[in-house]
Design a protein with these regions (language model features):
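Short acidic/polar active-site loop segments enriched in Thr and Asp
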Residues: 19, 57, 154
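Conserved small/polar residues in nucleotide/adenosyl-binding loops
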Residues: 187-189
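N-terminal small/glycine-rich loop or linker at the start of catalytic domains
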Residues: 21-30
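Short, small-residue-rich loop/turn micro-motifs
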Residues: 27, 63, 160-162
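Glycine-rich, proline-tolerant flexible connector loops at the mouths of alpha/beta enzymes
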Residues: 1-8, 66
């Protein structure tokens, strides 16, 4: 929208077969100070404006990194509160999908933790994104995935990973499906 207007973008989508599916991604939605929460609010206001204009119905959000000295319980409790707040802000017509990130310093870095948060939020428009790279990277448990309600999985990112020690890979180590070591056939509902 730096070189074109929102109306031009909306017209383009209206006149083409390609349709927007999700805003990927609202980064670092949790564990923010007051100024950071204001930044998130402003970004969500912008996302909502664009989404309404182009018919986009989902917002994928990523948790914060490097939240020193916070317990898992504290992180979950605060994430639940923030996602409920965001759920109210976007309204029931837009979904929010929490994408856990498979990095040791991510505040929500395993499927089980993310799913616990989504269950506690207990809103029909809040679910989870499963990224097979992140699932593999922090050794998320297949048992947790198998127990999950498939209706709460809103997005699925299909990726593979280089054969490196778990927890050591950044996004630059992503590969196309079946080019790496992730057994993609297992990561499903």
């Amino acid at each position: 929208l730096k070189e074109h207007t929102l109306d031009e973008l909306a017209t383009w989508f209206k006149n083409h077969h390609l349709k927007p599916w999700a805003y990927n991604t609202l980064i670092f939605f949790n564990q923010r100070d007051e100024a950071g929460e204001k930044e998130i609010d402003d970004e969500v206001d912008f996302i909502l404006k664009v989404s309404k204009a182009i018919g986009m119905k989902m917002l994928i959000t990523v948790p914060s990194f490097d939240v020193k000295d916070k317990t898992i319980s504290e992180i979950k409790e605060e994430a639940v509160a923030r996602l409920r707040y965001l759920s109210d802000k976007v309204g029931e017509d837009m979904k929010i999908s929490l994408e856990f990130c498979g990095a040791p310093n991510c505040s929500i870095n395993q499927f089980g933790t993310a799913y616990d948060v989504v269950k506690a939020v207990d809103r029909p428009n809040v679910g989870i994104t499963v990224d097979t790279f992140h699932f593999h990277e922090m050794c998320s448990k297949l048992e947790d995935l198998k127990k999950a309600d498939g209706n709460k999985i809103f997005a699925y990112h299909l990726n593979d990973c280089e054969d490196l020690p778990l927890g050591s890979c950044g996004d630059d180590k992503r590969l196309w499906p079946e080019e790496g070591v992730v057994d993609l056939s297992l990561i499903h509902i």
